[in-house]
Curated annotation (Swiss-Prot):
Zn(2+) 1 binds at residues 312, 314, 318, 324. This is Histone-lysine N-methyltransferase SETDB2. Zn(2+) 4 binds at residues 638, 691, 693, 698. InterPro entries: DNA-bd_dom_sf (IPR016177), Methyl_CpG_DNA-bd (IPR001739), Post-SET_dom (IPR003616), Pre-SET_dom (IPR007728), SET_dom (IPR001214), SET_dom_sf (IPR046341), SETDB1/2-like_MBD (IPR047232), SETDB_methyltransferase (IPR051516). The gene is setdb2. In the pre-SET domain, Cys residues bind 3 zinc ions that are arranged in a triangular cluster; some of these Cys residues contribute to the binding of two zinc ions within the cluster. Zn(2+) 2 binds at residues 312, 326, 365, 369.
């Protein structure tokens, strides 16, 4: 009995000493260095921040130990932390009785070099296993040596054996705890390590290396995509990683306490909260309905016909343009409209980031495609807002939007959402069963026409932020510079023509099925012949109206004539005896409708159907004055950090693209996000105001 007790105590003592050895700090860290480190952190005011990060890690580790989802490495980490905190042998005794032969740990000094084998053969490198998010690494020769730049150096080095990566490499990671923070921090929260490798080179630039939880090294986006595919990971994407050494994961800008603030103006509509802060006064943005996407959907306006031209069934993440039909659509549309496509590189997303705008539009994979929704590299905008944005009050420009974290180049920021409205630019109304509709027009009075994208904001005295200034945005991409034929745009209706009142507009009705529409058309003609419905003309409104109908105003202020029990349409009204209140006329009226007087006093984005679009075609645009998303607050700049891209997501109809914003450079945390309205000076001279962007290349005028 005594021999058995002595043997058990000897085993316990040896294993305790082994754990104590694991917790010994590196010999390279002296007492003076440690004191200096914490003094510097105290001076920077980051002591609380560092321990908060450590505490968060401990809470996660605590939960994993409790529910049994911890990995072997995490079990070892937990024992080391407990041992370092108190070396409580009584608490460890029962745990050490369990079988721990499956855990293999190699302990080496800092100055010793040990081969590290991972999934890729013949790789030799050290592993960074810290509690911090970033680690700086100096490389001399061929072996990197990790030194932390945020917290003290790693207390231990754990090496991994050769294996084939699979779902077990990411098992036990609870990704649902980290969905509303910096998207680039998500891999770090999932036990990935992001190391800066400083190589002795003339440019003295550091290189980024990611370490997977299983020890595999990820040196570029292709290796990241391969790893996520092999492990079947559905909570991480390629754009959650950044190999740009100018992008910091811990760059959090500190702002003054807002006089008025809100943690989420979207009211949980967005997957990421959209914060609001006013540090200048106690005003808030005017009330509006927050919409994640535009309404109504484009496919519904087209009567759910011809929604998608093609769909794919890729299994490689839609990387090969030769096999992906959706990638081919983007390339074909671009090649068709370009006079010469020689020297043009691959079009579309690269690692789920868009480096340059595509003037002819970008086709994403859709709901009909069989490709994996998370691993697909051609699905970005449809995933919605991922960045942490904040609406704030600027000193001179009204409301603006800034990012709360560093953003890499080509990253999707947000879309411009609103209510889709439709007008026609014909001198006479040609209502046919195939006409489209606008349901819920909120601004019948405000409209212009252009072949490209136009932004129109309400004009005020001192600023040009949302709902405060009228801005006309012509094509954000110069078609001429991209080789588009100029003669294709010769017949396009210009904004100047819209303001002069030479063109006449009408609001299209909601399209009905053809069978029902033909019945309604027949009924309308019968009513006109019987005298129940007449056509009346006036100096202000020329259009069909029901007899003895009082003149009323719509919600947007446009004067219309309608019966209390009937709905307004573009082609006529029906008497109360009619079976339907919505009419889609089938024949052109003898009298043209009233001349439209454009005042440009609403927040409106006009959508282009194609470079060949002419004034005879329907004009579709977004009105964000009453309904919209965070994109309605984006300001203008003559030197912007965003560019606009039309993306086809829920339909391939060229009339209904999604208007998306992407970064054209690295944007540091706290920087205001802006885009160029591309206003041509002199186009609307009576509505020009001073541009307040403050850039050296400022044009001084904007609408």
């Amino acid at each position: 009995m005594e021999q058995s007790a002595n043997a058990r105590q000897s085993t316990l003592r040896s294993r305790t000493q082994e754990l104590n050895t694991l917790s010994v700090l590196s010999k390279d860290v002296s007492l003076e260095d440690a004191k200096k480190y914490w003094k510097d952190r105290q001076a920077d005011g980051k002591v609380d921040w560092i321990f908060e990060k450590v505490l968060n890690k401990l809470k996660i580790l605590w939960q994993k130990i409790k529910d049994g989802s911890a990995t072997n490495l995490e079990y070892v980490r937990a024992v080391i932390l407990v041992n370092e905190a108190g070396n409580l042998e009584e608490d460890l005794e029962e745990d050490l009785k369990e079988d721990t032969d499956t855990i293999h740990i190699d302990i080496h000094k800092e100055n010793e070099v040990q081969e590290n084998t991972d999934c890729s053969p013949e790789r030799k490198e050290d592993t960074c296993l810290n509690l911090n998010t970033d680690c700086g690494t100096d490389v001399s020769g061929s072996e990197p040596e990790c030194n932390s730049t945020v917290s003290p150096p790693a207390a231990e080095r754990v090496y991994f054996g050769n294996h084939s990566c699979g779902p077990s490499c990411l098992s036990g990671i609870n990704s649902f705890l980290f969905t509303k923070g910096n998207p680039l921090q998500l891999p770090i929260s999932c036990d990935f390590q992001r190391c800066h490798l400083k190589i002795n080179s003339p440019d003295d630039l550091s290189h980024i290396l990611y370490k997977a939880p299983c020890g595999r090294s990820l040196r570029d986006y292709d290796e990241v995509h391969s790893y996520l595919t092999e492990t079947g990971c559905h909570f991480l994407a390629v754009d959650n990683f950044s190999f740009n050494n100018h992008v910091r994961l811990d760059s959090n800008s500190s702002f003054n306490q807002g006089i008025v603030q809100d943690c989420d103006i979207s009211n949980d509509v967005e997957s990421v909260p959209v914060a609001f802060s006013n540090e200048i006064d106690n005003t808030r943005p005017s009330n509006f309905i927050y919409r994640k996407t535009s309404w109504p959907p484009g496919y519904s306006l087209n009567n759910f016909t011809d929604i998608f031209v093609k769909c794919c069934n890729c299994t490689d993440g839609c990387l090969d343009i030769l096999t992906c039909s959706c990638l081919q659509l983007t390339a074909q549309a671009f090649t068709k409209c370009m006079e010469s496509s020689l020297g043009i590189g691959p079009l579309g997303y690269k690692h789920k980031r868009l480096q340059e705008p595509i003037p002819t539009g970008l086709y994403e994979c859709n709901v009909s495609c069989k490709c994996d929704r998370m691993l697909c590299q051609n699905r970005v905008v449809q995933h919605g807002l991922k960045l942490r944005l904040q609406v704030f009050k600027t000193n001179t420009k009204g409301w603006g939007v800034r990012c709360l974290d560093d953003v890499d180049k080509g990253t999707f920021v947000c879309i411009y959402a609103g209510r889709i409205l439709i007008r026609t630019a014909d001198c006479t109304v040609k209502s046919t069963p195939d006409d489209s509709v606008a349901c819920g027009n909120e601004d019948h009075e405000d409209s212009t026409s252009t072949c490209a994208l136009i932004l129109s904001k309400r004009k005020r005295k001192t600023s040009h932020s949302d709902s405060e200034v009228t801005v006309m945005h012509t094509n954000p991409y110069s078609m001429r510079s991209h080789g588009l034929s100029v003669h294709r745009l010769s017949n396009t209706f210009s904004p100047r023509q819209a303001r002069s009142g030479e063109r006449e507009f009408s609001l299209q009705p909601l399209r009905r099925p053809k069978t029902k529409t033909s019945m309604l058309q027949k009924r309308r003609r019968q009513l006109i012949e019987e005298g129940a419905c007449t056509v009346q003309n006036s100096s202000e409104e020329e259009g069909p109206t029901p007899p003895q109908s009082p003149e009323q105003k719509s919600s947007a202020g446009t004067k219309i004539q309608r019966n209390e029990n009937s709905d307004e349409t573009a082609s006529g009204y029906v008497s109360e005896e009619s079976s339907s209140s919505v009419i889609s006329g089938g024949h052109p009226l003898e009298k043209p409708i009233s001349k439209f007087k454009s005042k440009l006093n609403k927040t409106t984005v006009y959508l282009s159907t194609s470079p060949e679009q002419t004034c005879e075609e329907n004009l579709h645009f977004l009105d964000a004055s009453k309904e919209g998303n965070v994109g309605r607050f984006l300001n203008h700049s003559c030197c912007p950090n965003l560019f606009v891209q039309q993306v086809f997501v829920d339909t391939h109809q060229k009339c209904f693209p999604w208007v998306a914003f992407f970064t054209n450079s690295v944007v540091k945390a706290g920087t205001e996000l802006t885009w160029d309205y591309s206003y041509d000076i002199g186009t609307a001279a009576d509505q020009e105001i001073q541009c307040l962007c403050g850039q050296k290349t400022c044009k001084n005028k904007v609408v």
